[in-house]
Curated annotation (Swiss-Prot):
GO terms for cellular component: cytosolic small ribosomal subunit. GO terms for molecular function: mRNA binding; rRNA binding; structural constituent of ribosome. It comes from the Bacteria. The keyword RNA-binding applies. One of its GO terms (biological process) is translation. Part of the 30S ribosomal subunit. Forms a tight complex with proteins S10 and S14. Coiled coil: none annotated. Binds the lower part of the 30S subunit head. Binds mRNA in the 70S ribosome, positioning it for translation. Pfam families: KH_2, Ribosomal_S3_C. Keywords: Ribonucleoprotein, Ribosomal protein, RNA-binding, rRNA-binding. This is Small ribosomal subunit protein uS3. Residues 39-107 form the KH type-2 domain. CDD domains: KH-II_30S_S3.
Amino acid sequence: MGQKVHPHGLRVGVIKDWDAKWYADKNNYADLLQEDLKIRNHVKNKMYDAGISRIVIERVANRLKLDVYTARPGMVIGRGGSEVDALRKDIEQMTGKNVQINVVEVEDPELDAQLVAENIAAQLERRISFRRAMKQAMNRAMRMGAEGFKVQSSGRLGGAEMARTEGYSDGRVPLHTLRADIDYGFAEAYTTYGKIGVKVWINKGEVLPEVEDK
């Protein structure tokens, strides 16, 4: 089932950390989860062009702390911090809680599966050939030191009458190996022919357990 399950979810608690770092009892859990989803969607939609990879949410009492991982931190922060302040006020208004936002730069966007998937989707919307977009992304990632790369596009590719799935892969992407650091991203391209889904898997190497000194 390693082929079907979300690669990040499978590795949470093994080599990956949680994206929501809070605990709630059963009475509040659903409400807080829904609030998380609203926050993530709001940040993603408002800052889509900034290349947001992931958002980590921490909750302590009546406070919210957001770590926003982005390829373009300057775009999220804005001139003199104007954009990030506006974002903070939006979320405070939405939740009624005190909000702190940390902007974290993604060092290698070419090795971030979510950003790669969104980049390919953006190219498909600009009518660039899907094969060219996928191959270029794969070559860039492998040049940057990825151990393996897999990409898949599904839908009416090139405006074809019948939807199909096409993909490319290079190197090794062992989805069953839990110690393999597999990054996964998904994005959708809204074309005149309909939606095209883009999935990206990037193998960044194996994460070995730390050996304790005896």
